[in-house]
Amino acid sequence: MAEAAGEAGASERDPDAVRARRRLRVLSGHLLGRPQEAPSTNECKARRAASAAGASPAASPAAPESGTIPKKRQELMKWNGWGYNDSKFLLNKKGQVELTGKRYPLSGLALPTLKDWIQNTLGVNLEHKTTSKPSINPSEAPPSIVNEDFLQELKEAHISYSQDADDRVFRAHGHCLHEIFLLREGMFERIPDIVVWPTCHDDVVKIVNLACKYNLCIIPIGGGTSVSYGLMCPADETRTIISLDTSQMNRILWVDENNLTAHVEAGITGQDLERQLKESGYCTGHEPDSLEFSIVGGWISTRASGMKKNVYGNIEDLVVHMKMVTPRGVIEKSSQGPRMSTGPDIHHFIMGSEGTLGVITEATIKIRPTPEYQKYGSVAFPNFEQGVACLREIAKQRCAPASIRLMDNQQFQFGHALKPQVSSIFTSFLDGFKKFYITKFKGFDPNQISVATLLFEGDREKVLQHEKQVYDIAAKFGGLAAGEDNGQRGYLLTYVIAYMRDLGLEYYVVGESFETSAPWDRVIDLCRNVKERIRRECKERGVQFAPLSTCRVTQTYDAGACIYFYFAFNYRGISDPLTVFEQTEAAARDEILANGGSLSHHHGVGKLRKQWLKESISDVGFGMLKSVKDYVDPSNIFGNRNLL
């Protein structure tokens, strides 16, 4: 981010720099209006030369890297857990849970009630800790199988690569529980043989052509945040497996302020994209929970959804144009028109393809001016059912905020346990008064309360009008305004919740989240039945302590909603916790489908859920997908075996 940081510094010193930069980007948008004209072949060569300058192609680049994700990811991110190396939940010297580092609003703050919540909810004994491997042992990694002719041509193309064990292991997995558990205690049976780092579209074309020439297997990787086994290497793959890492394709190529679009390389992370657009006064508004690490190409290939989709749309609503390199050649449309009637939409063959057809290299996406005003809120309901009814009415009246999330009671209790220590006596008094007012004066049962968090953004006057409309609807369903602070805190927790699983693993707790979508008339029954199924399955499989089984409604639509489930259990006394966990999760998925839910709302299918795909889309639909795969990639070069 050296270039972006330099631009930001210049803008602070000279306001004219902002205007000048914006004018240049507008001009670039007109001059480079067609994606195929940017970047130029010479630019591609220059980036490759810089990447390999002064060293062999296998070495780290001499030039500064511009994106958040470096080539050596392990220098910044955990190799066997979620997120940044400097951020983790632990027990501090006072015996309180604390998040280390300085990256998040919660960092460095004590969470005085979380320890008791963990002990009481999951039966955890904090005197008993698990052990995990401190680092990757290169001797434990499967040996690299490399085609020497391919390697020689890769060197001649000056495309950076690595055969180091730590680089290969880091790209052998996503973030499913099974994958992280294996990293802590064992090793994968099969990992990539080589990691390659293209720096532009032309590099990807060269790599794919070489893979076709020598019949090699390619598994693309972006942010590495997959939760569907999407990155796991097939154990019986005998060909050289190439991990094609797009993280160095991380530029905004142009911004067109007339058409409100931006053309970007597909390896740019969400946080880099939003930060750079913000410098020019724009945003995409696409904010998945994995925003820090996930990339544009990954969003497209999994049909991602962001928490503010009510205003900005899901990824399929944001993409105007895209370019994909396949074994048959490059797929892209000839026009960037906003809508076309040219048969089935080619974009929808690419969206959701999960790395099985090719590599997405560039995309044109819609942008919007950065909202001038943002306001948080929260509403407490007597129970979950009343909350769901309220969200249904808000959706019916087409007045949903940018984001609205409804937590069931157990999720509400968990969120309350994540509340930082209060330093102000007055604030503590106010919190106590609010609790008294809701539970005693209004008669809410603390064990039934359900809470919705709200995020409004846009023009200030319209936001305030919108806010009043939503709270008026909530009141009709027994909802009470629960404060802006509670709403804001709920959203600030978004990017730290994933760190909680690593803490659990240290104390014999396995946990996971999964999602679905369902029609409104199925939401309540589905939530109840799935949570009950999880509890029943755990009991039948010998789990000694009642599991955490909870849910929340995270997104709303005219015809239904997205529902997230969270479950975890204490596995002390269980000889094979992974099998118990996976059988329970599979049973929960069966229950979801039996209750009218979808196979996935936005996580995708991967290898984890593909056993249910044919049932979900019909034999004919499955055959259609297979026919596309067979034509586009007849030799199965993109052989991650997701979906089919």
UniProtKB/Swiss-Prot annotation:
Its EC number is 2.5.1.26. Pathway: Glycerolipid metabolism; ether lipid biosynthesis. Residues 1-70 are annotated as: Disordered. Keywords: Acetylation, FAD, Flavoprotein, Lipid biosynthesis, Lipid metabolism, Membrane, Peroxisome, Phosphoprotein, Transferase, Transit peptide. It comes from Rattus norvegicus (Rat). PROSITE patterns: FAD_PCMH. FAD binds at residues 220-226, 289-295, 302-305, 354-360. InterPro entries: Alkyl-DHAP_Synthase, FAD-bd_oxidored_4_C, FAD-bd_PCMH, FAD-bd_PCMH-like_sf, FAD-bd_PCMH_sub1, FAD-bd_PCMH_sub2, FAD-linked_Oxase-like_C, Oxid_FAD_bind_N. This is Alkyldihydroxyacetonephosphate synthase, peroxisomal. It is found in: Peroxisome membrane; Peroxisome. Residues 10-19 have a biased composition (Basic and acidic residues). Its cofactor is FAD. Catalyzes the exchange of the acyl chain in acyl-dihydroxyacetonephosphate (acyl-DHAP) for a long chain fatty alcohol, yielding the first ether linked intermediate, i.e. alkyl-dihydroxyacetonephosphate (alkyl-DHAP), in the pathway of ether lipid biosynthesis. Homodimer. It is an enzyme of class 2 (transferase). Residues 188-370 form the FAD-binding PCMH-type domain. GO terms for cellular component: peroxisomal membrane; peroxisome. Optimum pH is 7.5. GO terms for molecular function: alkylglycerone-phosphate synthase activity; FAD binding. The modification N6-acetyllysine is found at residues 88, 333. Its main location: membrane. Residues 1-44 form a transit peptide.
